[in-house]
Amino acid sequence: MSRKNQAPKREVLPDPLYNSKIVTRLINRVMLDGKRGTAATIVYYAFSAIKEATGNDALEVFETAMDNIMPVLEVRARRVGGSNYQVPVEVRPERRTTLGLRWLVNASRARGEHTMKDRLAKEIMDAANNTGASVKKREDTHKMAEANRAFAHFRW
């Protein structure tokens, strides 16, 4: 592995339809095998289905869903005196978004609807209503952090 400097972070361009960087990141998360066009079609169809079902702006529903999914705390393993402790730490903003998108897409893929378009739309709507597997994942993460609160003094 190279010992040179860390590669610079590449700027994510906003998507053409909603002019939003987080939508571009969602498209990149949904994308499989480099098929960005297919991923964009899935996301845009899901957004149109959300607008149809709720009557609200799809981007607002998506942002509400992301606020409900993104974790504030998580646990990290820390080795102290020969034993591992799960230490609760705050999540940095960039990682919050990344985890939220990851959990949203994974929960969508695990759903039972017929197409990915429908799965994604339903999961986003569920997350906006504080239900669904992605919100449960966040709650589980927060519960773990709360349960290990006694080890918070090991934070680094």
From Swiss-Prot:
Protein name, as recorded: Small ribosomal subunit protein uS7
Any single GO CC term annotated in Swiss-Prot or TrEMBL for this entry: small ribosomal subunit
Subunit structure as annotated in this protein's UniProt entry: Part of the 30S ribosomal subunit. Contacts proteins S9 and S11.
Record function comment: One of the primary rRNA binding proteins, it binds directly to 16S rRNA where it nucleates assembly of the head domain of the 30S subunit. Is located at the subunit interface close to the decoding center, probably blocks exit of the E-site tRNA.
Cleaved signal peptide residues: none
UniProt keyword list: Ribonucleoprotein, Ribosomal protein, RNA-binding, rRNA-binding, tRNA-binding
Family as reported in the entry's similarity comment: Belongs to the universal ribosomal protein uS7 family.
PROSITE patterns xref list: RIBOSOMAL_S7 (PS00052)
A Pfam family it matches: Ribosomal_S7
Entry GO MF terms: rRNA binding; structural constituent of ribosome; tRNA binding
GO BP terms, alphabetized: translation
